[in-house]
Regions:
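Phosphate/diphosphate ligand-binding glycine-rich loop within oxidoreductases
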Residues: 1-60, 170
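Short, charged/polar "capping" segments at the starts of alpha-helices
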Residues: 14, 97-104, 168-172
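Glycine-rich adenosine-cofactor-binding loop
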Residues: 44-49, 56, 60, 65-84
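Conserved S-adenosyl-L-methionine
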Residues: 85-90, 180-183
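NAD(P)-binding Rossmann-fold cofactor-contacting core
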Residues: 88-112
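Rossmann-like adenosine-cofactor binding region
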Residues: 112-185
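Adenosine-phosphate binding glycine-rich loop
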Residues: 160, 164-229
Length: 229
């Protein structure tokens, strides 16, 4: 018997009309990545946000205070909304070509959290003190591993960095963060945690953080073997 399935781009919105109902973050974001088959029909969930929060928690980076969000694409919506729901002050740094998209994201977040403090700036103008910097761009992803979305100086007063990129294990951005003494968390942790949360929905099984950390390491080792020889 099928307990459920995972859904990915480009089907996260397309499956919604097939759902009996949406739960939690799936309802908020109108985006489904996990479907549970129940006696009452198909129920849509979104575990991307859960994976993100778990990754931050296990990496020692609280989602609080002043947050710099780089980019405003699909995964950026999840990060922006989670930061707003946590009461963070958001500085969204984007390319000039993405200003309109960033404004649309801000409007979406403001509808969810009307009182949110949300500023949009140019990526090359980002500066200041941040409790957390989140990279929601693909910059630094394999094979362009020598690239970073921001210069090292931007991280001088940043306490923690989360990079959604998971290949390579340690992006240029994360290397710079470590050099500045900041906590550095890669995207593989979010990927594995969202899968673990889907298993919890289907089977009711809770996962020990140490067990998940072990799976993260196994996934990173296999990725390095395949891509980096």
């Amino acid at each position: 018997k099928t307990r459920g399935v995972n859904v990915t781009i480009p089907h996260k919105q397309a499956v919604i009309p097939l759902m009996t109902r949406l739960e939690g973050r799936a309802q908020i974001y109108q985006s489904v990545n996990t479907i549970a088959v129940t006696p009452d029909g198909a129920v849509g969930y979104n575990t991307d946000a859960d994976g993100f929060r778990h990754a931050l928690q296990e990496g020692g980076a609280p989602l609080s205070g002043r947050v710099a969000l780089l980019g405003c694409g699909g995964v950026g919506r999840t990060f922006a909304c989670e930061a707003a729901l946590a009461g963070c002050r958001i500085v969204n740094a984007v390319r000039e070509a993405d200003r309109e998209m960033a404004a649309a994201l801000r409007t979406f977040v403001q509808q969810l959290v009307p009182e949110v403090d949300y500023t949009i700036v140019s990526l090359d103008a980002l500066q200041g003190e941040f409790d957390l910097l989140i990279n929601a761009t693909p910059v630094g992803m394999y094979p362009h591993t020598d690239a970073s979305p921001v210069a090292a100086g931007v991280l001088a007063h940043t306490k923690a960095v989360f990079d959604a990129v998971y290949n390579p294990r340690e992006t240029q951005l994360l290397q710079m963060a470590k050099a500045q003494g900041a906590a550095a968390i890669g995207g593989m942790a979010m990927l594995v945690w969202q899968a673990a949360d889907a298993q919890t929905i289907w089977f009711g099984r809770e996962f020990d953080p140490q067990a998940v950390a072990g799976v993260v390491e196994e996934a990173l080792a296999e990725m390095e073997r395949v891509f980096h020889g």
